[in-house]
Amino acid sequence: AIQTVADIGYDAIELAVRSGWDADSAKLDAKRRRSLRTQLADSPLRLTSLMEDVPPTDDRQQAVALERLKLAAGLAHDLVPDAPPLLQTVLGGGKWDEVRTQLRDRLAEWVKVADETDTIIAIKPHRSGAMSQPADAVWLIEQLGNPPRLRMVYDYSHYAFRDLALTDTIRTALPHTAHVALKDAARQNGKIVFQLAGEAGTIDYGALIRQFHRGGYRGDFNCEVSGMVSSQPGYDPLAAAKTCYANLAEAFRQAGVERSSHRD
């Protein structure tokens, strides 16, 4: 898969290390880690992110989250010792006003893990989560004193159709963003569905990339395929990767932003 992604033309890659997935950080043995490390070192791709899913919704889940974040951090350093990728996750459901102080206190423990493992943890606002927009993530980060290893993931598909303007959300998120995820959101039969980046035409990726770049962001713009897409009958991951690449390469051209690669 790494070589295939490189052959399509991408500059970077993200690995899903969630429980039960192929690269599950709790299951990936030393032999496979060495193989992945070699493949990445020999590839033009940068490994920019490891995706987890560890919402700290109660004390038990917080304990699980802390353990899995430590496992993911270890994997990050095993795969790219000189520049370990960040770890990203959502924070789960609930009503924001009711759970935000609890989330803040639990994230304080995450920051200790990030500091101990020399790894960045990036929290992702999700439209169905308690933390659902950039302002929420910024509140948590600032409440904890802007720790350098606690950042956020920006994904406009979670803010679309919510009276949250693209430019405004970027302005709020930009100082704290370590990773940008790109996928489309569309309204179908009164519901919001996710699609491949550029497929629905609902998000101006050229404007998004341009504003982030002008604001000093130099991290990854990651093409994310939603489970709403990958779970469909007949889903073709290779075709999806090619479609996303073509759409986002064009967005970079429209933005007038030069892409950087592993070899730069």
Residue locations for each model-derived region?
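Glycine-rich, proline-tolerant flexible connector loops at the mouths of alpha/beta enzymes
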Residues: 14-41, 94
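Soluble or luminal CAZymes and related metallo-dependent hydrolases
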Residues: 28, 32, 64, 68, ...
